[in-house]
A protein has these predicted regions:
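Core structural elements
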Residues: 66-68, 82, 87
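Flexible loop/turn segments at secondary-structure boundaries
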Residues: 25-27, 70-73, 90-93, 140-141, ...
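Acidic/polar loop patches that form or flank catalytic/metal-binding clefts of enzymes
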Residues: 26-32, 124-131, 210-216
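C-terminal structural cap/anchor segments
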Residues: 84, 98-135
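Mid-domain catalytic core of redox enzymes
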Residues: 1-76
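C-terminal structured subdomain/cap of oxidoreductase catalytic cores
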Residues: 1, 5-10, 14-26, 79, ...
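A glycine-rich dinucleotide-binding beta-alpha-beta segment and adjacent secondary-structure elements
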Residues: 57-65, 119-187
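A glycine- and small-residue-enriched flexible loop/hinge segment at structural boundaries
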Residues: 79, 87-97
Length: 221
């Protein structure tokens, strides 16, 4: 029920940018992390901004992935395949993204700020004009497309009362044979944790009480 979520704390959401860029970008390695000097203020915008004042931080601490740096097959010849993740508050009102600037105006403006920041901080002055494909995704996309509570990208925050065995269990206490797996549950957020969560559901169903990983999937009867 909706009331169950009222006292829960959502983890961060994100502004995501998927960029196809003409020409090679020697300034970016496969992984690049950019941090603002005012760390405390930057992350306060992500975790503690009041309702009605939640937005994409500017400047922002962010992550850049340039997979074509090590695997040229993920981009056309003489192009780069760039992914950018900017942590934001879990607030759908921050906006919805789209393809080639078709998203909400304020979210696309925030994406422009991020691109300008990367260009400035990494020494790529012509980055914006070299972008040939652009897709953005914001908290409203997580809420609308993925049904993510509060538009979070990471599920329930790992506060003390929402960590480890304090997180929701993987089996319903009200509906027989209803099981759950995902980032809101035990053991936690992130793709590896979600896969482990699915493994724990399987082991519960087949009554496997071992501590080791599954060696072979067995039919569920």
């Amino acid at each position: 029920p909706t009331s169950w979520w009222e006292n829960k704390v959502a983890g961060p959401s994100a502004l995501l940018l998927y960029l196809g860029v003409r020409g090679k970008i020697d300034e970016l390695d496969h992984h690049t992390l950019l941090y603002t000097k005012d760390w405390k203020s930057n992350f306060a915008e992500v975790f503690h901004a009041p309702d009605g004042n939640r937005k994409v931080p500017n400047p922002a601490s962010l992550y850049i992935c340039n997979p074509s740096k090590t695997d040229p097959s993920v981009a056309p010849p003489d192009h780069e395949n760039i992914f950018v993740l900017v942590p934001t508050a879990a607030e759908p009102a921050i906006g919805q993204g789209g393809i080639n600037r078709s998203g909400d105006e304020k979210l696309e403006a925030a994406a422009d700020q991020v691109i300008a920041q990367i260009a400035d901080w990494c020494g790529i002055p012509d980055l914006a004009e070299r972008i040939v494909v652009r897709r953005t995704m914001g908290p409203a996309d997580f809420a609308g497309e993925l049904n993510a509570w509060s538009g979070t990208a990471l599920g329930m925050a790992h506060t003390l009362g929402q960590s480890a065995f304090f997180r929701p269990k993987n089996m319903s206490s009200k509906v027989s044979n209803l099981y759950y797996a995902g980032h809101n549950l035990v053991p936690g957020i992130g793709l590896p944790m979600c896969l482990i969560g699915a493994e724990l559901v399987y082991k519960r169903i087949v009554d496997d009480r071992s501590a080791s990983a599954i060696a072979e999937l067995k039919p569920i009867k």
